C-alpha cells in the first residue's frame, strides 16, 4: 500500500471471500480493513515502461524487535524472554532468490524474571537468579505468490486433506457459507498432452514434484529416503500422471543451488535428538496451492524406529533382536517414515480410520497380506503387523485358564 510518499505493510487476511463481479464484494471489502503493521518512507520511485518500482529501507525494521521478523509475545512467554538487547542483536545474512528472500538474524533477549510459561516455569528458581541473556538465531522467509492463483478445489470432509478455511458471501444470498480449499500441488498436463490426458492416457506433468535430499544426509540413508518419495508415483498414476514425483540427490556441482531457494523442495537432515520427523508445506492462502516443502528429518528418529520395530516385530523377526539393526532393515524403516512424511507434504492428513477397515483375521492371512498389505493407508499409524504372531491361545494362556 502506497500513501503520501509512504509504503505501508498490511497483515493480509484471506478469511472472507466474495467475487469482485458480485454485489457483496464492495461491502465485504469495506468491512475487512487489513491492519497496517509498518510504514516506510519511499526512498525513490522509478518508472520502467508500464512498471513502477518503489525503493524503501527496511534495515532498522528487520533488526528491531517486532512480530514480523522476531518472536511473538506468546513465544517470548514460552521461552522466558523479555526485552531485546539491541547491541547484541544484528542481521547476519540476507539472500535473494528468484522467488524468495531469506533473512537470518541473531537476537538476544533479557530473561524474564521467573522464567516462561513452558519448561522455564519449572526452572523458575534458576531464572530468578540468572542474568545470562538468551540468544537465538532466526530465519525469516518472504515468498512471492503466483501472479495467477491456481484454481482451487473445495474440501470434502470424507477425504483427508489439509484445507484452508474461509467465509463465502456469494453462494448463499441470504447468509454466509463456510468453505475450505484443500492444499495440493499444481499438477497439470503439458499443453501437447492435454488431449491424451483427457482420454485417460498416462502423461507426464508440466512441472513434476521434485524433492531433493539434503547434501548433509549420511550417504547410506539417501537411497531409502529417495525410495520413500518415489513410492508415491503409483498413486499419481491413478490420477493420470506418470513420473509426477521423484526424489533426487541435491546437485554438488552447481554453486547456485541452495536449500534456501524456494524453488527447491527437500528432505532436510537435522542432527537433533528429537525422535521424530515432520512434513510441513508452504501453500498459497488464496488457493491452497502447495508451493514448496522442507521435510524435517531428525537424526534421532531412528531410535524411535528401533523401539517401534523391536517391540512390534521382535517376536517374529530375528533381525529385530539386535542391539543395533542392520543398515538394510533400518533403511527400510527410514523409507517407511519418509513415505509417510511425503504424504503430509502432498496435503494429506493422518488417516487413523483406515486400519479399522481390516479385520484381524485378514491380518493373519499370509496370502491376503501379501496381496493387500496390513493397512490401507501409509498415513495411518498402523506401524507393523504384530497380529501375525498370536493366531491361537499361547501356552501361557492355556496354563492361566486352568
Where are each of the predicted segments found?
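Conserved small/polar residues in nucleotide/adenosyl-binding loops
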Residues: 4-12, 390-399
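Short, glycine/acidic-rich hinge or "gate" loops at secondary-structure transitions
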Residues: 240-252, 351-362
